[in-house]
Amino acid sequence: MANNLKRLDSYLVPGKHIHLIGIGGVSMRPLGLVLRGMGITVTGSDMNASVSTDELIAKGIEVHIGHRAENIQGADCIIRTAAAHNDNPEVAAARAQGIPVFERAAATSGLSLWAAAVRMMQSAP
């Protein structure tokens, strides 16, 4: 995990703001939709507009085309695609501001554990 001080699961709660770098990607788009469905404020950025980014915008997710430091304003944490390296302006700005940056793989793993816990709680007597 990119940030050992704070665990991602502490951000997977309604009312938090998570910014996704590369939100138009094949694994990031559904992640954004799931997070929004959980009551989390989701914003994101991608290098290019696409059918995926248009769908996210239509569903109420703020999408920025291009990567700029100001895109992360107000975010509690960042989830980045593997294609967004440390020199990405949003990653660099988050680190400079002390905003935790997590890898997409950690986010999907965290959500899988969260979903399993919910299922277990629902099936408990």
Predicted feature locations:
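N-terminal leader/targeting and accessory segments in enzymes
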Residues: 1-104
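Walker A (P-loop) phosphate-binding motif
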Residues: 20, 105-125
